[in-house]
A protein has these predicted regions:
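A short amphipathic helical element positioned immediately N-terminal to and/or at the very start
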Residues: 1-4, 77
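Acidic-histidine catalytic/liganding microenvironments
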Residues: 6, 81-85, 169, 249
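Short, strongly hydrophobic transmembrane alpha-helices
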Residues: 6-36, 44
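Short beta-strand segments
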Residues: 16, 51-54, 90-94, 119, ...
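Membrane-proximal extracellular/periplasmic loop immediately following the first transmembrane helix
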Residues: 31-116, 149
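Generic structural signal for small/hydrophobic residues in well-ordered secondary structure
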Residues: 34, 52, 81, 87-90, ...
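"Rare, low-scoring activations can occur
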Residues: 82, 153, 160-162, 185-262
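Hydrophobic secondary-structure segments that place a key small or acidic residue at a functional site
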Residues: 116-210
Length: 262
């Protein structure tokens, strides 16, 4: 009789217990999946890689004389970065930036089926990007001398995930595709050819694999990110040394060193 009288309280105890068990199960499952994801390769190697950002001095951004020599200044800056002690290789790129949440996303379709559009993350990169981030193709090969926006068809590298989605599991090397969103632009680029297929890619350790495409970058500008691979014995204190040594040296024309991080 006492249990019957306390039946409402007992029901709430069971409800609370079920809620706690569900939350506990969810937490364990979440941690497990994070750990599994963290052990999977991102598809590219960011260890010993530092990201360098430039910016324009506000007082000089409207100086037409200085800005007309922008390419020369940036070339000097890039050369100084390449020559800095401990730097093994340098590159520049823009689009989807690892670990920042700054992503560029568009769709591509194979010429064989223009209705089959696959969305993917994009990176526009210089030829040395693949050395800095140690990208090794699964099939095909990277040809630096052909990595040019003016090459026709324009060469691209794709992650395995994108290649499989676009070309129905066929080896994507040598296949062609186009970006339907560019068709109405002044100078539409209608033909991309897959130079090589890369391992599956993630934006960081804890994300799932997503379709990725790499395209040749335009010449270096201030909005590009510059990445450098640093020798292992130069890693300790590299950020602080670089900022101290290069803050003044990279202040060329309207540009200055904005940030460096690993």
């Amino acid at each position: 009789r006492q249990m019957w009288n306390q039946r409402h309280a007992n029901v709430w105890v069971w409800v609370e217990l079920v809620v706690v068990l569900v939350l506990l199960w969810y937490s364990i499952d979440l941690v497990y999946n994070y750990e599994v994801a963290a052990r999977q390769s991102k598809g590219y190697d960011t260890e010993n890689v530092f990201d360098i950002q430039l910016n324009i001095k506000p007082a000089l951004q409207n100086d037409s004389v200085l800005m007309s020599h922008s390419a020369e200044y940036l070339e000097q800056i890039y050369h100084l970065i390449q020559q800095y002690q401990g730097v093994e290789e340098a590159c520049f790129y823009y689009g989807t930036i690892p670990y920042t949440g700054n992503n560029m996303y568009e769709g591509y379709a194979p010429h064989s089926d223009s209705t089959h559009v696959v969305g993917c993350f994009i990176r526009y990169v210089s030829p040395t990007y693949f050395k800095v981030f140690r990208l090794q193709p699964l099939s095909g090969s990277f040809e630096a001398e052909r990595w040019d926006k003016n090459e026709y068809p324009m060469p691209v590298l794709m992650s395995e995930t994108l290649s499989d989605s676009l070309f129905s599991g066929r080896n994507g090397v040598g296949e062609t595709c186009f970006n339907p969103y560019f068709l109405n632009s002044v100078q539409p680029e209608t033909n991309y050819k897959v130079m090589a297929v890369l391992p599956a890619h993630k934006t960081d350790e804890y994300e799932r694999y997503e379709p990725f495409i790499y395209l040749p970058s335009s010449p270096l500008t201030y909005w590009h990110h510059i990445a450098v691979r640093v020798a292992s014995n130069s890693i300790p204190g590299f950020t602080e040394r670089f900022m101290q040594d290069m803050q003044g040296k990279l202040s060329i024309g309207p540009y200055y060193l904005y940030d460096i991080n690993s």
